[in-house]
Amino acid sequence: MIIAVYPGTFDPLTRGHEDLVRRAATLFDKVVVGIAHSRNKKPFFTIEERVDIAREVLGHYPNVEVHSFGGLLKDFVRDQNGRVIIRGLRAVSDFEYEFQMAGMNRHLLPDVETMFMTPSDQYQFISGTIVREIAQLGGDVSKFVFPSVERWLQAKAKERREQSAQGGA
């Protein structure tokens, strides 16, 4: 059984992410979507919310699982018996960072391959950061995320606006 691990923050999960998962699910026996705790970022959604969102969107794929992880990716990949790490490349600007990470992962996990996948053409420009910003400003994100994710974004953006109006975090 060949297991692929697709790690990321998925904050939020976009149509581009789902596109890669859908295509990877046809290539591998199992795809594990690993949602990172993101210690170096300030996520819009909590880790629990990101896992719930991903499970809502991806739950209909029989060979896809969603789990959260903290710590090193190498440990998560080992725990999942992963043989391949999937990384998405939207643009040439993504390549340098991803190439360095693939080299480090090869050093830490010599028997695990990194596979770069590009999103389908209609999703190449989508990023979670841009989607979050549009949602926070009240814009339409329906072309970039699934309806359930749009509802999560609207609710979280409203919650944040209310907190700001009250002087909260």
Curated annotation (Swiss-Prot):
One of its GO terms (biological process) is coenzyme A biosynthetic process. ATP binds at T9, F10, H17, G88, L89, R90, E98, Y123, Q124, F125, I126, S127, G128, T129. It is an enzyme of class 2 (transferase). GO terms for molecular function: ATP binding; pantetheine-phosphate adenylyltransferase activity. It is found in: Cytoplasm. GO terms for cellular component: cytoplasm. Keywords: ATP-binding, Coenzyme A biosynthesis, Cytoplasm, Magnesium, Nucleotide-binding, Nucleotidyltransferase, Transferase. Substrate binds at T9, K41, L73, R87. Pfam families: CTP_transf_like. Its EC number is 2.7.7.3. Its main location: cytoplasm. The record marks H17 as: Transition state stabilizer. It catalyses: (R)-4'-phosphopantetheine + ATP + H(+) = 3'-dephospho-CoA + diphosphate. Belongs to the bacterial CoaD family. PANTHER family: PHOSPHOPANTETHEINE ADENYLYLTRANSFERASE. This is Phosphopantetheine adenylyltransferase. It comes from Bordetella pertussis (strain Tohama I / ATCC BAA-589 / NCTC 13251).
